Design a protein with these regions (language model features):
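Conserved loop->alpha-helix
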Residues: 1-86
Length: 86
């Protein structure tokens, strides 16, 4: 359960469009390990599953439905995004 406390802001660094959705890459200094892959992180209020983490780069997958129903369709490279842990 998310508690509404924003732990940090990340920066949108890359989008990778796929047939069924989009991968989004966010630069962040959140202290996460490989064991956290599969965990949920709220990104600007949208609960996303962490797909991969490399150094300070977090990777998430967004389905087309998630993009269309959220503000993620308006995100731009370099934009700040709030990150919240459960």
């Amino acid at each position: 359960m998310f508690n509404g406390i924003i732990y940090q802001q990340g920066t949108v660094s890359k989008f990778l469009k796929l047939n069924a959705g989009t991968k989004i890459f966010i630069k962040s200094k959140l202290k996460l390990d490989k064991k956290d892959i599969g965990s949920s992180i709220a990104c600007d209020g949208v609960c996303l599953t962490l797909v991969s983490k490399r150094k300070n780069l977090l990777e998430f997958y967004l389905s087309k439905e998630s993009i269309n129903k959220s503000k993620f369709k308006y995100l731009k490279i370099g934009q700040k995004i709030n990150l919240e842990l459960p």
